[in-house]
């Protein structure tokens, strides 16, 4: 479904962010993209979403180029940013979730249906008229996900989704991510803190210094994480079976 071939990316000041990335992500996969801060994780998913253009190489989603076929790819791919405040644009919860569908030019009846559905899925129905600035950190995170869901994407990109959240908030967001995966969505999540999500994912891709170092099942790569500045989950260090944060 997603193909990155010989992808390089340099920022305008000449800083190299990614070097020769080759990665195929099948439909329905739950992929963890991990690496230390500044490794290129966010740049990678921004290329997939079409927010950035590769300096060299190609990115395709269902055979479409996120830059040249931006309108079609916006229907396929949704991104949840690290800072939910940067993604919230409406005055109320309902208005914010409606923003995306409205900009697609959808009929009012379909906008209403999508908004109601997204609010229900994310447990925000009772907060639909609440001002966004009054929401807690966890509620803002759920709102940013609801706004993406209202666009009905097949692929959802989560950039450091557990930042700024307490333990109950992390569990809540993780529970929704797992549910979306079970519903058939392709899920990509970036983080330097693998402990919270590694028990749920199908595969890990390790990014270090802008390069894709390894990709494979969590069980195979778990104890190789420290080589790339990533702390393995506690259960792996203790020699135990995987433990989910949802248990």
Regions found by a protein language model. Give the residues of each.
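Helix-to-loop junction immediately C-terminal to a conserved catalytic motif
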Residues: 49
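Conserved ABC transporter NBD signature motif
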Residues: 57-65, 73
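Conserved ABC ATPase "signature" region
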Residues: 109-127
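H-loop/switch region of ABC-family ATPase nucleotide-binding domains
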Residues: 191-192
């Amino acid at each position: 479904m997603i193909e990155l071939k010989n992808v390089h990316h340099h920022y305008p000041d000449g800083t190299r962010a990614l070097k020769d990335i080759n990665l195929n992500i099948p439909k329905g996969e739950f992929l963890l993209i991990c690496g230390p801060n500044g490794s290129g994780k966010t740049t990678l998913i921004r290329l997939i979403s079409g927010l950035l253009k590769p300096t060299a190489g190609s990115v395709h989603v269902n055979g479409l180029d996120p830059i040249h076929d931006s309108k079609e790819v916006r229907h396929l791919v949704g991104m949840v940013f690290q800072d939910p405040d940067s993604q919230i644009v409406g005055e109320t919860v309902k208005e914010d979730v409606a923003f995306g569908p409205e900009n697609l030019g959808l009929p009012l009846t379909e906008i209403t249906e999508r908004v109601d559905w997204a609010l229900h899925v994310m447990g925000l129905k009772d907060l639909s008229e609440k001002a966004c600035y009054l929401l807690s950190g966890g509620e803002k995170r759920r709102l940013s996900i609801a706004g993406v869901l209202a666009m009905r994407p097949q692929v959802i990109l989560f950039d450091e989704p557990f930042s700024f959240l307490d333990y109950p908030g992390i569990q809540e967001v993780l529970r929704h991510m797992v549910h979306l995966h079970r519903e058939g969505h392709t899920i990509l999540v970036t983080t330097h803190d693998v402990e919270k999500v590694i028990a749920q994912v199908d595969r890990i891709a390790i990014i270090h210094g802008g390069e894709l170092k390894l990709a494979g099942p969590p069980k195979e790569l778990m104890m190789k994480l420290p080589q790339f500045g990533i702390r393995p989950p506690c259960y792996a260090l203790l020699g135990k079976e995987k433990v989910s944060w949802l248990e």
